[in-house]
Curated annotation (Swiss-Prot):
Domain of life: Viruses
Keyword terms, alphabetized: Host membrane, Membrane, Transmembrane, Transmembrane helix
Name of the featured protein: Uncharacterized protein US29
Compartments where found: Host membrane
Similarity field: Belongs to the HHV-5 US29 protein family.
Primary subcellular site in the record, as a coarse category: host cell
Organism expressing this protein natively: Human cytomegalovirus (strain Merlin) (HHV-5)
Length: 462
């Protein structure tokens, strides 16, 4: 059961993340064709006033999803004008150095194109898992880093997709670290926090002099603060641009990536089916589905499915079920059953008809291991004139037809074997002395076999 759960969880994870649209060269280009900006930061010369190291390499910013009330923005605007009125430039120059050296200018473009992203591993996922606000409103979709790509006219850049800004049609605040030289992948691949958050912004991974922020919804969304940092604001109403149509090259790359994703999905679904479908259906599919089709149905849906299976396997349709009130007779059964008027009763057995004799029984040897049926041997003598003549009568459980005695001398030698007290019994009913019951049994069996061989068994019951 645990193995099945593990496979189920793994398949669900891959279907959620692995089958999502992977942001590669074909996916990034049509997604981020919105307003973009470039923030350039130049290192201060050594002769300038000493600045804080953290302030030279980081830009302060405000998160887009942190709700900024109008009162707060008015307060900030009032502070900024107050700083300008109190000679804020001099204060910035002494606190942070030259403000113009921190931010040299902004540049807007709507035609960014990436290439050669396939040479590096891509970790960017788009349209993966949606994020929701506490009031159940879509806040954005989870996205991760990308890889080193060629941006525009052949410059190397590390493409990073950060979740939390805008919708998927605008790239979710995509950031590109633009570098002058060769781009090197960072040591940590997945973000621990948002790239543009309350406080600081991570420096560029390729070159600390140029950082691109684009995928914004309007030019006013990214602003330069009085301290020389980068801030986020809400776009005014009606200033959001419409996303442009993708190019042909982008569609080809998108289809190529989609085929790979579909292949991965098919393989994962096959693994899940191997866990769910029994092995008998794989080893003997015809016998398995034949047995399923012939099994009784429990519902209408089950009956319809099994009817389709019967048609596919070439089996006859199931017999029609009669209503519970009616009871129909099959035609074959009706033909075999004659009407009641033609029946004739068989004659009753006569009591005078003698029973057939039992099958002949041959007495086995006394030393045989087979159990010999108990023999009941009786002797009787005629009363009166025939007192001297003695006949030997043997009654057995399986006897032979009675035959007349041949000689009286031989018959007189016969003795009686009684049960359960086995022994040699004389005419007066006493057991011979000097013999135990075991010897009496063996001796009597020998005598009986000799009598049967010489004279046969005499029946005097009549």
């Amino acid at each position: 059961m645990r193995c099945f759960r593990w496979w189920l969880y793994s398949g669900w994870w891959w279907l959620t993340f692995g089958c999502a649209r992977t942001v590669t060269v074909g996916f990034v280009a049509p997604t981020v064709r919105a307003q973009s900006t470039v923030v350039r930061s130049e290192p201060a010369p050594p002769s300038e006033t000493r600045r804080d190291n953290n302030d030279t390499s980081y830009f302060s910013s405000t998160s887009f999803h942190s709700s900024v009330s109008p009162a707060t923005s008015v307060d900030r605007q009032f502070r900024r004008t107050t700083y300008d009125r109190w000679d804020g430039r001099r204060w910035l120059r002494t606190r942070y150095g030259n403000a113009s050296a921190c931010v040299t200018g902004t540049q807007w473009s709507t035609n960014f194109f990436f290439s050669q992203c396939e040479h590096y591993p891509s970790f960017v996922k788009l349209n993966g898992v949606q994020r929701w606000t506490p009031v159940r409103r879509p806040m954005g979709e989870v996205a991760y880093y990308g890889g080193c790509c060629m941006v525009g006219g052949g410059n190397r850049a590390y493409v990073i997709l950060v979740s939390g800004y805008g919708t998927a049609s605008y790239g979710n605040a995509l950031r590109v670290d633009f570098g002058r030289g060769n781009c090197t992948a960072p040591k940590r691949t997945y973000p621990r926090r948002l790239e543009l958050h309350d406080g600081r912004t991570d420096p560029s991974r390729c070159d600390p002099y140029q950082v691109y922020f684009y995928g914004l919804q309007c030019p006013e969304q990214l602003v330069i603060t009085a301290h020389g940092g980068v801030g986020m604001r809400r776009c005014p109403t009606g200033s959001r641009p419409t996303p442009s149509r993708p190019h042909r090259h982008d569609l080809e790359n998108e289809l190529h990536g989609l085929c790979v994703d579909l292949l991965v999905c098919v393989l994962l679904l096959a693994l899940l089916l191997l866990e769910l479908v029994p092995m008998e259906a794989v080893r003997h599919p015809l016998l398995f589905w034949r047995r399923v089709a012939l099994s009784p149905s429990t519902s209408k849906v089950d009956r319809a499915v099994k009817l389709c299976l019967r048609r596919m396997l070439g089996l006859p349709p199931p017999p029609s079920v009669a209503p519970p009130g009616e009871k129909k007779e099959l035609p074959a059964q009706a033909a075999l059953s004659p009407p009641l008027t033609t029946w004739s009763l068989p004659p009753f057995p006569s009591t005078r008809i003698p029973d057939s004799p039992p099958p002949p029984y041959q007495l086995r040897h006394a030393t045989s291991l087979v159990t010999v049926p108990t023999l009941l041997l009786y002797t009787s003598s005629d009363i009166g004139d025939t007192a001297s003549e003695t006949t030997c009568v043997a009654h057995a459980t399986y006897g032979e037809p009675p035959e007349p005695a041949r000689s009286t001398a031989t018959v007189q030698e016969c003795t009686v074997l009684t049960a359960p007290n086995c022994g040699i019994v004389n005419n007066d009913g006493a057991v011979s002395e000097g013999q135990d019951h075991g010897d009496a049994v063996h001796h009597s069996l020998d005598v009986v076999s000799q009598c049967a061989a010489d004279t046969g068994v005499v029946d005097t019951s009549e």
